[in-house]
Amino acid sequence: MKQALLLSSSSYKDTGYLKHCKNWIYDFLKECEVWDEQVLFIPYAGVRRTNDEYEQKVINCLEYKNIASIHKFSDPKRAVVEAKAICIGGGNTFALLYYLYKFDLVEAIRQRVEAGVPYFGWSAGANVAGSTMMTTNDMPIIMPKSFDALNIFPHQINPHFISGKIAGHNGESREERLEEFLIVNQKSLIYALPEGTALRLKGENATVMGMENSPVLKMAYQKETELIKVGDSFKL
């Protein structure tokens, strides 16, 4: 059975890095019975830090030692095939998907997760779990082989969702940008995840998790946006 935890963000307000979701991750690993297993960490989205720095930051902030970064393995694809749990950190989704394709890992990760290997990721790691990465918020742009992503969650994900416009900003709001995506991709569904929310996938069902009563938005072409409350579940 597919098991995944897709987190909108690594931080929530001023709680600090991974602090708001640390217990969610702990519970997820325990529920999936991999608490004592090694988690394969994929740091490729971390443009601003080295792979070693990213790995150590996650170990320190999660206070969890059973993490090994994929860059330390001589054969990345074999590391995925043998992984007991997989984690992808946030950062730049373009760079992340570029390297996942470069090392031929996209299909390997998808197959492992479909076979029941637990997967969790935040920000770019949640975005890339969707059907494509085309609702990312990211710059700079580095061209991956394809925008098709892991398809663990068979729809679009927009992490770090924030509603409305910043005072003095004359560009499009996030809602407007996502509506534009739907105009040119009319069969797609977008799930917009505010910071502090997550999707917990079990098989073909998903449940919204959240720090507060901040709903996930389900957006479809020429349809009214649906608000999915924390604690509610839906079919994939």
Q: Over which residues does each language-model region extend?
A:
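Glycine/threonine-rich flexible loop motifs
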Residues: 93-103, 167
